[in-house]
Structure formats: structure tokens, C-alpha cells
Swiss-Prot record:
GO biological process, alphabetically ordered: gluconeogenesis; glucose 6-phosphate metabolic process; glycolytic process
Primary location group: cytoplasm
Family: Belongs to the GPI family.
Pfam families the record matches: PGI
Known EC number: 5.3.1.9
The UniProt record lists the keyword Cytoplasm: yes
Keyword Nucleotide-binding: no
GO molecular function, one term: carbohydrate derivative binding
Catalyzed reaction equations: alpha-D-glucose 6-phosphate = beta-D-fructose 6-phosphate
Record-given protein name: Glucose-6-phosphate isomerase
Catalytic residues, chain numbering: 320, 349, 453
Length: 526
């Protein structure tokens, strides 16, 4: 495409939000006018779907739930007074609690103030807060934050060990919608043990974010505080609920600024005009790039260190929402878009080589931040700063990819602050909603995650049966015999992996034989 034609295409498809200073450029996605004409009816339906969703329609039919994360920054749009109170009252509770903690009115029993936070949660309860903390927390926040987002014992130990004697001034936030998520439950129990081991009364250091009446809500009845999660907010869209706002506010982040930015972006993404709706432009680009079937991966490249966790946050938001086997009509469709990325220009020295010359199975989203830093920059050579290099690398990489027929989107923001981060969250939340409508999938449930939980529970049940069989046998058993005695002769491989793990962790299980040849192993207990 000639320079003048490409420049005109850029002008034709550039979106700019004046108040937010946001640019969305999809000119390097190679759709044509015929494609736009063909997809307009789908967007008419998508706009209607979003309108009905925001009015309180059951947008998650598999679970019979409303989908209301857009109301979190515009309570006046909630369908009734009860829902409005579910938004405004927790926000007030958060602000009052945070003020008391930061002033030292609410404090730990053996210290003047809380100095740190341990956030226990997984999935959306971790990825959103981690992204926001990395993007917005100051160099010296009023409270430092540490995350336990897995059931990895060594990872948990690392967090506790690094805190040293600051554990006595550390507030624990346990976030679980149902209270039944195993990883979060395990993290909570590990924290309780760590506090008690150090002579600390855990309930006086803990708060919960959960649904009223949940298992976690009952466990936390004597904790410092409980903050409600709404039934109509999913984990991956919960950053602007108590899930994300509480830890952000405790770090001194302006949560009202985040909500304001999200609200402004929501208003922009309600516009029923494809060219003037930034989230619709993203969904359009995703659909074209992947042929409406997720045939190409989404590579997210923010050229700003503080946005390095954006790709991990979007990975869940996009993949858990859109990665579905069935569509809303019950047809098998295998939908989804794979998301990965880190940051520029670091990635130019990692996998961009493949992006430029390897398998063309992707499209890139560049995130550009206009402000280099607060304050002036030195000149590394006449008239050139380190920020100029970064800006040059964005343009250069974009051009190099396009020349080799690799498409890209560029999102440009003025700076990284609470307002722009809130707007980014809202931009992508709506884009996912639109794309879900375009491909006719339920973007608000996660049956595959639930299937994984059930499978893991069955392995733990098998482990109990294996231990019982070993203790009752009182002698060495080969793997096949052990599997039979455990009641599962068809699960020899699973039994082998269970006993191998138990033996490695001094759980009383002993293995004799050639470890490289499982059929030679004899297993015993004692």
C-alpha cells in the first residue's frame, strides 16, 4: 500500500477520545470496505445485546445471572435501588475502612499501624490487583502489597519469609466470591497457621472480600471486616469492585480516578456507531484478524514498564471469557483468542524475531504512552532521549511487521494514571463483550475452570484411598496392586504420580526400585 493511501487509511480509522486523550488506531489491520459492510449487522445485534445487558437482562444464561460490572462505575444505571445500594454502600465502606487503617485508627495489636498487605486470591482476584498495583502504586506507598495467588507451598513461604517481623503489621485480604475456591482457602489456612506460629491472633489481621452468606463470609465473622462481592460481577471483571478497589486504596491509589476513567470510557463504548466506538473497533479487528474463529493469537506489547502485567490481566479477561466449546445455541464451535506478551522494547530482543519472520499466526496490540517520565530527560546524544528511543522502537517494530504482512493495533494513552488505567480496563471489558456477541458465545461463565476443579478433587479423593490401602496392606505393593486396592485399577498412572509426590515430601510413603521405570517400583508406608 502506497504511503499516501496508508496515511489516508490511518486518518479514516483513527479514533480519538478528547477528554481521556485516548487514541485507537486499527489502520494496520487489513480489512476492506466489503468486510465492514458484511459485519455491520452483527454489530447492530452486539450494540442491542449490550443495551439489554446494562438494563439488567440475564446475559449469563448458563448461570441465570445478570452481568453488571458496568454498573460499578455508574450506579445510576443499575436496574433497581437494591442493586444501586450493592454498589454505593461497599464503596463507602471501603473508603471509611481505608481511611481508618491509614490513619492508624484500625491497627494491629502489636504495632502502631499496618505497613503491608498480603492479598490471598486467584484468577481475577489476583490478576487485576497485581496489574493495578504494578501500574499505579507509588515508589513509597503507605502499604506495600504481596500476593499469594497459588497453592504453591514454597511460594507462600517466600512471601512470609520476606516479610520477616513485619508480619505483625501486615493486613491479610482474602478474596473469594464463593469461599469454595481451593487455592484461596489453602492460602487462607496457610496464613492463619503462619500468624498463629508467630503468636499472632489471625482474625485481628484479616479481612474478607466475598459474597454475603458464602462459606468465606461465615469463616470471617470475627475478622476485622467483610466486604461484599456482588453476584452479578464475575472474577475477571471485578477489578473495579471491592476486589480491586480495596487493595488499591490501601496502597494510596486514587480509586475514584479509576472509576471516573472507566465511566468515561463506558460512555464512549455505548455509542452505536462502529467507527466512533473504540471497543467496537477492537472487537472488529479481533474478528477480522482471526477470521471470527480465533485463528490468530493476540500479542499485547505495552511500551511502558508499569504496564508489564497488562498482558497477564488481559490473558484471563479475553481467554476465560471467549474460550468456549459451545455457542449460545449449543453448537460446537471451539472459540477463543490466545493472548500473550510482556513489554517493549524488551520483547524486541526475545520473540519479536519470530513475529517478524516466523509463523504469521498472530496480530499485535501496541500500547503507547506519550509521557516518558515525570520531569525532564537527559539527552543521550544531541536531541535524543531514552524515551525517544522507546517511541522509535514502537514505530519501527510496527512498520517492520506491517511490511511483512503482520497486522497490528495501536492504542495510545497520554500517561499512566488512575484515570487512564480505569479507562483501559473498561475499554477491554466492553471489547470482550462485543466480541462474545459477534461469535455468539457466553462470555460470562467458565465451565472449563469448574471441570478442572472437579478433576482435581477426584485426584485428592484418590490420594486418600491410596493412603488407606497402603496403611491397611502393611507391606510393599506394586503400582497395579495398589491401584486395585485403592478401588481404581484404571488409574495406575495417577496413583504413580500421587505416591511419587508423597515420597518426595516425606509423607511416610517409600519407593523402592528404578525410578525411571515405574513398573519396577514397590510402594510402602511407614
Amino acid at each position: 500500500m502506497e504511503y499516501q493511501t496508508l496515511w489516508q487509511r490511518y486518518l479514516d480509522w483513527l479514533y480519538y477520545h478528547q477528554n481521556l486523550g485516548f487514541y485507537v488506531d486499527i489502520s494496520r489491520i487489513r480489512f476492506d470496505d466489503a468486510f465492514i459492510d458484511s459485519i455491520k449487522p452483527k454489530f447492530e445485534k452486539a450494540f442491542k445485546d449490550m443495551e439489554e445487558l446494562e438494563k439488567g437482562a440475564i446475559a449469563n444464561p448458563d448461570e441465570g445471572r445478570m452481568v453488571g460490572h458496568y454498573w460499578l462505575r455508574a450506579p445510576e444505571l443499575a436496574p433497581n435501588d437494591e442493586v444501586r445500594k450493592e454498589i454505593t454502600e461497599p464503596l463507602k465502606q471501603i473508603e471509611e475502612f481505608v481511611a481508618k487503617v491509614l490513619k492508624g485508627t484500625i491497627k494491629p495489636p502489636t504495632a502502631d499501624k499496618f505497613t503491608d498487605i498480603i492479598s490471598v486470591g486467584i484468577g481475577g482476584s489476583a490478576l487485576g490487583p497485581q496489574f493495578v498495583s504494578e501500574a499505579l502504586a507509588g515508589d513509597f506507598p503507605p502499604m506495600g502489597i504481596h500476593f499469594i495467588d497459588n497453592t504453591d507451598p514454597a511460594g507462600i513461604d517466600r512471601v512470609v519469609t520476606r516479610l520477616k517481623d513485619r508480619l505483625k503489621s501486615t493486613l491479610v485480604i482474602v478474596t473469594s466470591k464463593s469461599g469454595g475456591t481451593p487455592e484461596t482457602r489453602n492460602g487462607m489456612l496457610e496464613m492463619r497457621h503462619a500468624y498463629e506460629k508467630n503468636g499472632l491472633d489471625f482474625p485481628k489481621y484479616a479481612v474478607a472480600v466475598t459474597m454475603p452468606g458464602s462459606k468465606m463470609d461465615q469463616v470471617a465473622h470475627d475478622w476485622l471486616a467483610r466486604f461484599p462481592m456482588q453476584d452479578w460481577v464475575g472474577g475477571r471483571t471485578s477489578e473495579l469492585s471491592a476486589v480491586g478497589l480495596l487493595p488499591a486504596a490501601l496502597q494510596g491509589i486514587d480509586i475514584q480516578g479509576m472509576l471516573a476513567g472507566a465511566k468515561e470510557m463506558d460512555e464512549a463504548t455505548r455509542v452505536k456507531d462502529l467507527k466512533n466506538n473504540p471497543s467496537a473497533l477492537l472487537a472488529l479487528s479481533w474478528y477480522y484478524a482471526g477470521n471470527g474463529k480465533g485463528e490468530k493469537d493476540m500479542v499485547v506489547l505495552p511500551y511502558k514498564d508499569s504496564l508489564a502485567l497488562l498482558s497477564r490481566y488481559l490473558q484471563q479477561l479475553v481467554m476465560e471469557s471467549l474460550g468456549k466449546e459451545k455457542d449460545l445455541d449449543g453448537n460446537t464451535v471451539y472459540q477463543g483468542i490466545a493472548v500473550y506478551g510482556n513489554k517493549g522494547s524488551t520483547d524486541q530482543h526475545a520473540y519479536v524475531q519470530q513475529l517478524r519472520e516466523g509463523v504469521p499466526n498472530f496480530f499485535v496490540t501496541f500500547i503507547e504512552v506519550l509521557e516518558d517520565r515525570q520531569g525532564s530527560s537527559i539527552e543521550l546524544e544531541p536531541g535524543v532521549t531514552s524515551g525517544d528511543y522507546l517511541a522509535g522502537f514502537i514505530q519501527g517494530t510496527r512498520q517492520a511487521l506491517y511490511e511483512n504482512h503482520r497486522d497490528s493495533i495501536t492504542i495510545t494513552i497520554p500517561e499512566v494514571n488512575p484515570r487512564t488505567v480505569g479507562a483501559l480496563v473498561a475499554l477491554y471489558e466492553r471489547a470482550v463483550s462485543f466480541y462474545g456477541s459477534l461469535v455468539n458465545v457466553n462470555a460470562y461463565h467458565q465451565p472449563g475452570v469448574e471441570a478442572g476443579k472437579k478433576a482435581a478433587a477426584s485426584i485428592l479423593e484418590l490420594q486418600q484411598n491410596v493412603m488407606k490401602a497402603l496403611k491397611e496392606a502393611g507391606t510393599e505393593l506394586d503400582l497395579e496392586t495398589l491401584s486395585q486396592k485403592a478401588g481404581h485399577p484404571d488409574k495406575v498412572e495417577a496413583v504413580y504420580k500421587i505416591v511419587r509426590h508423597l515420597a518426595a515430601n516425606n509423607r511416610g510413603v517409600m519407593l523402592k526400585g528404578d525410578l525411571g521405570k515405574p513398573t519396577t517400583l514397590k510402594v510402602s508406608f511407614g
